[in-house]
Amino acid sequence: MAAPEDSKMSPANSFGAVVLGGTFDRLHDGHRMFLKAAAELARDRIVVGVCDGPMLTKKQFSDMIQPIEERMRNVETYVKSIKPELVVQAEPITDPYGPSIVDENLEAIVVSKETLPGGLSVNRKRAERGLSQLKIEVVEIVSDGSSGNKISSSTLRKMEAEKASKQKQPAEEKAS
């Protein structure tokens, strides 16, 4: 499943603590690949900012996003399943930065090509606060193989909404 681009990443266990962020709704293979890459880079601790509140309002079908507790638990469970010795710190974030601009012990931030600007923004904020710059590690996100589209929680929520609406229609037709 590893793409050739992965070879550009630092070797395993290169950093004491790494950070990454995301919504992590309906934990899917794209999330697992992203979390696995981050876990492999971390020696001691992985900090995962899980989007909540205002960070969710612009998401498609945001009303269908799993509760924050469930998403954080799924992240923690998955990371522990692949690297049990890591300290996993999943926490809700309500802005694009979360712990990445206050935790002075972080050494690297894991991003996708799409979220690279966010990683650069984190380093600008860290510089303003007198914190060290994080090494930015870019993970190539996997596509779903069949269509070549990036795996997306929004797509999964949309499919779920469409399925729910189709199931509702026959019941409504019988009622009329």
UniProtKB/Swiss-Prot annotation:
Main location per the UniProt record: cytoplasm
Family of this protein: Belongs to the eukaryotic CoaD family.
Gene3D superfamilies: HUPs
Organism of this sequence: Arabidopsis thaliana (Mouse-ear cress)
GO function term, MF aspect, one: pantetheine-phosphate adenylyltransferase activity
Matching NCBIfam families: cyt_tran_rel (TIGR00125), PRK00777.1 (NF001985)
Keyword Nucleotidyltransferase on entry: yes
Biased composition (Low complexity): 145-154
Region (Disordered): 145-176
Enzyme class label: transferase
Designated gene of the protein: COAD
Places the protein is found: Cytoplasm
Name of the protein: Phosphopantetheine adenylyltransferase
Catalysed reactions listed for this entry: (R)-4'-phosphopantetheine + ATP + H(+) = 3'-dephospho-CoA + diphosphate
Domain of life: Eukaryota
Keyword list, A-Z: ATP-binding, Coenzyme A biosynthesis, Cytoplasm, Nucleotide-binding, Nucleotidyltransferase, Transferase
